[in-house]
Swiss-Prot record:
Protein name in UniProt: Pyrrolidone-carboxylate peptidase
A Pfam family hit: Peptidase_C15
Gene source species: Vibrio vulnificus (strain YJ016)
Primary subcellular site in the record, as a coarse category: cytoplasm
Keyword Cytoplasm: yes
Record SUPFAM superfamilies: Pyrrolidone carboxyl peptidase (pyroglutamate aminopeptidase)
Quaternary structure (record): Homotetramer.
Domain of life: Bacteria
Enzyme class: hydrolase
EC number: 3.4.19.3
Gene Ontology CC entries for this record: cytosol
Function comment: Removes 5-oxoproline from various penultimate amino acid residues except L-proline.
GO biological process: proteolysis
Length: 212
């Protein structure tokens, strides 16, 4: 039995829901053959986010960590390729922190790559008709903060980990005319991502880059 830790954020920025948390709640109640799914709610708070996930890692000892976050304006599921060592918050987090041009970990490197097979994930979802593309920027808010912090602590351990951004839910997007994706599609996509991560030892080699 392999363990998968799924993390989703609490609502922030005036929203009443966060699609990442709704998705994690849905997935935690589902069953996949030979897979135990563990859900974890993450505060949108600097450093507390990292501590919450690392505590869950130590408690559950998962084989795979999939961190999920909301990306307003994106129309596809986007596996993040790289986390950068920078906090530069455009808005306050849920505890009122708003660091500007500060490192996440002062002694850490400039960046960490995801250890997920991001190209295999993208190909699998695209083949299933689910919009998915690799992203090369997780932003500079708490999503990137968590992504970098977890990669920093897990990069020497045999635990695959990475970050996935997802679009808004339709009920969030309707008022602002932004792209959205149904929870049903997100659930199907996340199931495929988990299976791909657990079954793919080495990522596929095909172009996934961008011009700019």
């Amino acid at each position: 039995m392999r363990k998968v830790l799924l993390t989703g954020f609490e609502p922030f920025g005036g929203e009443s829901i966060n699609p990442s948390l709704e998705l994690v709640k849905q997935m935690a109640s589902r069953a996949l053959p030979q897979v135990e799914i563990i859900g974890c709610e993450v505060p949108v708070v600097r450093y507390q986010a990292i501590e919450t996930v690392l505590q869950a890692v130590e408690t559950h000892q998962p084989d795979l960590v999939l961190m999920i976050g909301q990306a307003s304006g994106r129309c596809a599921i986007t596996p993040e390729r790289v986390a950068i060592n920078l906090d530069d918050y455009r808005i306050e987090d849920n505890a009122g922190h708003q660091p500007v041009d500060e490192p996440i970990i002062a002694t850490g490197p400039a960046a960490y790559f995801s250890t997920l097979p991001v190209k295999a994930i993208t190909h699998a979802l695209q083949q299933a008709g689910i919009p998915c593309q690799i992203s090369h920027s997780a932003g500079t808010f708490v999503c990137n903060h968590l992504f970098y912090g977890v990669q920093h602590h897990l990069h020497t351990r045999a635990i695959r980990s990475g970050f996935i951004h997802i679009p808004l839910l339709p009920e969030q997007a309707s008022a602002s005319n932004q792209p959205s994706m149904s929870l049903e599609t997100l659930v199907h996509g996340l199931e495929m991502m988990m299976i791909t991560c657990l079954e793919t030892e080495q990522d596929t080699k095909h172009t996934g880059g961008t011009i700019c």
